[in-house]
Amino acid sequence: MEEMFCFQCQQTAHNTGCEGHTGVCGKKSDTANLQDELTGELIRLARAVAENERSRSSDELMLKGLFTTITNVNFNSDTVKKLSDEIREEAENRKPGKDAYNVQKIWEAPEDIRSLKSLILFGLRGTAAYAYHAWALGYVDAEIMNFFYKGMRILGEEKGMEELLPVVIETGKINLRCMELLDKANTESYGDPIPTEVPLTIEKGPFIVVS
């Protein structure tokens, strides 16, 4: 089993990153490496989808792919690999002969470049979680979706700090826009949240905790 590298959560080993065969969260190295491969396939897809040439299928794969790589969302290697294959097929249908991006280039980049690209990547993953839930309710924002492709393309390019920093800022702005979209999707679908009293007495379990 190959070793892993993952440092996207705040609980990484030694506060520097999980290596070896298992992460602090329980993720195995084979799954971590498959998630890196999936990310590389998403960069390939972003390159294959030119601006304004998105489709429902490419959007769904972009959102699913990014959402899948968030901490504790999917540790099933088989489903991660299956999704990678679907993304690869979508990219091949659009622009054949292009290779997936090697995400190790990000982890091995100079510290400042690695940090800025990681902020973009992890920001896109978090935003994708909001966008995916809004998408499931039928709400899509073209500006948000276009930025997923733009951001993933930039991760696969040789960019300096002066070019990456504005994209980091834009990632934050898009994240806020996506939170607004999800709020609209939820309130228009389910109504406005209402503060409600709940009992605090201890009952016999088991329980499902919902926050």
Region roles according to the model:
Residues 1-211:
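Metallocofactor- and cofactor-centric catalytic cores in central/energy metabolism, strongly enriched
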